[in-house]
């Protein structure tokens, strides 16, 4: 039960989902604080703007009157969680708490191996523009409105955590093999999504080209979206330009509108179509959906752009072969005449080993590829693979960059440099930006 008679203490408050949930509760008027590592993270700014107290990890943070919300990155032996359990304080996991909170709203989740954050951010933006909407997005963005009609949220499949949710609607962007430290293969991933499908109340929106999603069964209706004639919701007459993407949306043979989105890549056409489908079934005015889609600015760490000197730098969270392919496709659409240089930080040893050939194939879609050392997770500090092993399979380069020497990236003229990864790849990006800013102008 969620109550105002306690202070909610978030262990790992800087995590993307945790920070978003903390912001939601704070907006709803509950007392919120949290703890985490000292290192600055991109989620921290919004917490600070909301005056939410962030403490360093310490058992001294725990006292009577707290309810502990434990981040899923931490086990029960983490010092604060362990202390809270010993003190008899209520301890609830992030996904369990969110599952309880969602019961108060018409909840619309977004699940999938890839595209969750981009789609949930787009969904939250559109719904917020037309109705009172609370939302929780995986880029650390969260908003709570007490009398909201909708709650848009990201539903993470890792360790089957999304089984804590019984949403009214669920968008399923795809099923793919990821998280090899937990899932044994694609069949195991499908089993998780199938279990969640039975928990959906009103309707599922699933990408029609995904063979795994086509096998789903549910007590709720399943609406497929895509570009094929057998999809319930279809995007037709797609035009992808340097200004973004536009298309006509159809529900069966009914034209429900012409839409423009300032987004790039085929995946963003599909993400937009899924949001249109939800809006259509909830009888939201189509003209308002057109307006909101055209005004979307994107989410954090998803194709985030900046210009330094004559270089365009793109920062993206892509850390799976399918995501890399989508990000590079988007870069090609927006910059068809520029050289695309990829800088990829492999994320975890298990994922790098399990998907190495697929990583190489996706990265080869760039004009030139650089790698950083593998980013290890808290669950695995070492492994029997290196970035050089991946680099050996890449035909478009594959050199390993070191943080203290980013100069190999200077060999390109007016490039689009795409930094990708789910770890701390941004430190390489910042080092490159500093190098560029320190360069003297060329002599005439």
Swiss-Prot record:
Pfam families per record: Mur_ligase, Mur_ligase_C, Mur_ligase_M
Keyword Cell division assigned: yes
Gene Ontology cellular component list: cytoplasm
Listed pathway(s): Cell wall biogenesis; peptidoglycan biosynthesis
Signal peptide bounds: none
Subcellular location: Cytoplasm
EC main group: ligase
Reaction catalyzed: UDP-N-acetyl-alpha-D-muramate + L-alanine + ATP = UDP-N-acetyl-alpha-D-muramoyl-L-alanine + ADP + phosphate + H(+)
Entries under Gene3D superfamilies matching the protein: Mur ligase, C-terminal domain, Mur-like, catalytic domain, NAD(P)-binding Rossmann-like Domain
InterPro entries with a match to the protein in the record: Mur-like_cat_sf (IPR036565), Mur_ligase_C (IPR004101), Mur_ligase_C_dom_sf (IPR036615), Mur_ligase_cen (IPR013221), Mur_ligase_N (IPR000713), MurCDEF_pg_biosynth (IPR050061), UDP-N-AcMur_Ala_ligase_MurC (IPR005758)
EC number in record: 6.3.2.8
Keywords: ATP-binding, Cell cycle, Cell division, Cell shape, Cell wall biogenesis/degradation, Cytoplasm, Ligase, Nucleotide-binding, Peptidoglycan synthesis
GO biological process terms held by the UniProt record: cell division; cell wall organization; peptidoglycan biosynthetic process; regulation of cell shape
GO molecular function annotation: ATP binding; UDP-N-acetylmuramate-L-alanine ligase activity
Amino acids binding ATP: 112-118
Family affiliation: Belongs to the MurCDEF family.
Record's function text: Cell wall formation.
Name of the protein this chain belongs to: UDP-N-acetylmuramate--L-alanine ligase
Species this chain originates from: Latilactobacillus sakei subsp. sakei (strain 23K)
Lineage, opening ranks: Bacteria, Bacillati, Bacillota, Bacilli, Lactobacillales
Gene from which the chain derives: murC
């Amino acid at each position: 039960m969620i109550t105002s008679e306690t202070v909610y203490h978030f262990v790992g408050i800087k995590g993307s989902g945790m920070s978003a949930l903390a912001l939601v509760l704070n907006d709803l008027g509950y007392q919120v604080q949290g703890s985490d590592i000292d290192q600055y993270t991109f989620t921290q700014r919004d917490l600070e703007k909301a005056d939410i107290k962030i403490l360093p990890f310490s058992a001294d943070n725990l006292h009577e009157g707290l309810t502990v919300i434990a981040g899923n990155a931490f086990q029960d032996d983490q010092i604060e969680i362990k202390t809270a359990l010993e003190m008899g304080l209520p301890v609830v996991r992030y996904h369990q708490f969110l599952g309880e909170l969602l019961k108060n709203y018409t909840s619309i989740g977004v699940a999938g191996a890839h595209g969750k954050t981009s789609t949930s951010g787009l969904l939250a933006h559109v719904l917020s523009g037309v109705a009172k909407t609370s939302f929780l997005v995986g880029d650390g963005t969260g908003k709570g409105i007490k009398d909201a009609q909708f709650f848009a949220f990201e539903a993470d499949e890792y360790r089957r955590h999304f089984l804590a949710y019984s949403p009214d609607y669920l968008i399923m962007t795809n099923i793919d093999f990821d998280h090899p430290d937990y899932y044994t293969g694609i069949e195991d991933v499908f089993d998780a999504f199938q279990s969640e499908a039975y928990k959906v109340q009103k309707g599922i929106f699933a990408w029609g080209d995904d063979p795994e999603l086509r096998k789903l069964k549910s007590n709720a209706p399943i609406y497929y979206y895509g570009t094929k004639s057998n999809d319930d919701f279809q995007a037709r007459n797609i035009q992808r330009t340097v200004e973004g993407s536009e298309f006509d949306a159809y529900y069966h043979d009914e034209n429900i509108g012409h839409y423009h989105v300032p987004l790039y890549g085929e995946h963003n056409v599909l993400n937009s179509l899924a949001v249109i489908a939800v809006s259509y079934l909830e009888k939201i005015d189509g003209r308002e959906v057109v307006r909101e889609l055209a005004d979307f600015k994107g989410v954090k760490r998803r194709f985030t752009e900046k210009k330094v000197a004559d270089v365009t730098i793109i920062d993206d969270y892509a850390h799976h072969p399918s995501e890399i392919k989508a990000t590079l496709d988007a870069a090609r659409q927006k910059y068809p005449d520029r050289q695309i240089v990829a800088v990829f930080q492999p994320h975890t040893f298990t994922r790098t080993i399990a998907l190495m050939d697929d990583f190489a194939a996706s990265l080869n879609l760039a004009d030139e590829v650089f790698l950083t050392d593998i980013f290890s997770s808290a669950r695995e500090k070492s492994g029997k693979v290196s970035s050089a092993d991946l680099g050996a399979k890449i035909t478009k380069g594959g050199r390993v960059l070191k943080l203290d020497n980013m100069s190999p990236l200077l060999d390109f003229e007016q490039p689009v440099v795409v930094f990708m990864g789910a770890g701390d790849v941004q430190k390489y990006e910042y080092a490159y930006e500093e190098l560029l800013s320190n360069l003297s102008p060329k002599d005439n």
